[in-house]
């Protein structure tokens, strides 16, 4: 190439870069914002990045979020804001801030003109409702939830945001004094803000997709079911977490509220006085009053975590199983990782990852019995027999350890996700349903070689980390990442993961109740990647056989869960509690065997006892359930008025601060008032405690942290006194949490199926 040609090429490239499209200052309902335009190469493509745009006013402790008043001049949106207040990994100090409700936006730009009408993808981070942030952990100066790779490779707008977590986000008395769900309402405020303002950034406000993982995936699910989001969401993706997961809904919030109140010195005898005291308590003290034990647990971690969403009769008007008609027009993808339960199994049973340690029958039986408390001895025996059937033919430690992981994967993630998919499909009108299983093995070097895809391993591939930080990844990792970004962004554009601007490795068929089809995501995908009936025999066991077992009384129940005082040793099972539970031997009463026959047939959704696995709606499922609404009889009304229209830039004197849109669109619907009294108190059955995700994106080779790995979960506090007693009697009658001294409060039984 001659010198003249090189000069011409150089000038052409410089002209392309100089003339690349960019947004500049953007007008929002709060005022003008200006981000950064990042060049992506010599051809002129770029991405506009806005960090730290407020979507709500600074928070007040244990109160709903409020609209932001706006600002004067142009807001420089160039740096991530602090996360919401939460405990550090040592749980002896806090970081973050109460003023934390900010969002971040990535907008891909071409060479000629700024983008218009792009699909919008809003990410909700996980972290057990205890920790996390909208930008995630930092790895090689690249944050986990940096949206650049998704935005530029998929040609979509990506939005991430902060929401309140831990006691400040989810503490509730179970009534109107402290209704809870503040973190969910923060999420809703962010979604509504995007709906009203994203057109100014080049997005299509009528094509919004939510996606999230773990507690974020469950949050996505809950947001689609809430009547507050009617008309705001077009599509949704739940990764390793749905509203029906046993760790999502707290059925005994008063118990946990009292534990925190005792720690900070607030009265617990009267809910109103307790609530007033908690609201004026130092938010840092509230955060540190709740600690999760991370080692030496006597019971599964599921028992120790308490600050999660509640059924408040308003934002979540009823049990999520009865709200799927609200998502009838929302396209939905849901799936799990093939060893989602590994990190939790390794905490509950540390021998899992230790080659010189063995898992015994007694160990596994004890674990099973602690997950099946409400079904007593028979529930423990039948479940143990079903899961250990292969041990006679293969008694190896690898097989036994895999069994423990499969058990926790099924209970915590896979079974509830399969039920959620069936519910969505059964209620869907125009919406499509898709299922997946992520099976690309974990990169964690300290794990045994048999470990598959652990909890949160999928996040790094969705966010394109193999491209953003290529030195830590292999070509096969980039293959997986490319496929996931293609499927996810195609789905955001069209509602079909196969159709869009990105080529996919194989066709992903929709999920139906007849075929139970799912796509297995691996490094090498083809026609054989589309499979049927994932772990059907185990799914049928939980939704049919186990469900049919009688619920036991408190005297018959096996282990008593811990009381919440992480400093005290949990009380072991009663009865012959001096010895560890012994697995059944010989013919233990011929426990029921999981249904056989045509295993390819989809499992029958559970019915009957509502205390057990979620039950699909019966009768006219097309009619959405009406939430309790005072004496009005009408469901909450989503934002109306001018909420669908983008804010109009000010005219005349531009020096005056812009005025946000008027009307009620900026705030969430106001709960009805009247003489109806406080919303119903949730039952005490299921603790809904979320598992704690792995920590991690630390500098070692690409193991994705669960969101905000820099912090650790935070749990039960206070001396509870006597050990709590599992729910008693007929599970169809939801027990009401005690309202007197919390030392008499019941500890929820964590599993319903």
Curated annotation (Swiss-Prot):
Residues 559-745 are annotated as: 17 X 11 AA tandem repeats, glycodomain, O-linked (mucin type). Activated by bile salts such as sodium taurocholate. The active site is at 214 (acyl-ester intermediate), 340 (charge relay system), 455 (charge relay system). GO terms for biological process: ceramide catabolic process; intestinal cholesterol absorption; lipid metabolic process; pancreatic juice secretion. It holds the Pfam family Mucin-like. Sequence repeats lie at residues 559-569, 570-580, 581-591, 592-602, 603-613, 614-624, 625-635, 636-646, 647-657, 658-668, 669-679, 680-690, 691-701, 702-712, 713-723, 724-734, 735-745. Residues 555-753 are annotated as: Disordered. N- and O-glycosylated. Keywords: Diabetes mellitus, Disulfide bond, Glycoprotein, Hydrolase, Lipid degradation, Lipid metabolism, Repeat, Secreted, Serine esterase, Signal. Residues 1-20 form the signal peptide. It is found in: Secreted. Interacts with CLC. Belongs to the type-B carboxylesterase/lipase family. This is Bile salt-activated lipase. It comes from Homo sapiens.
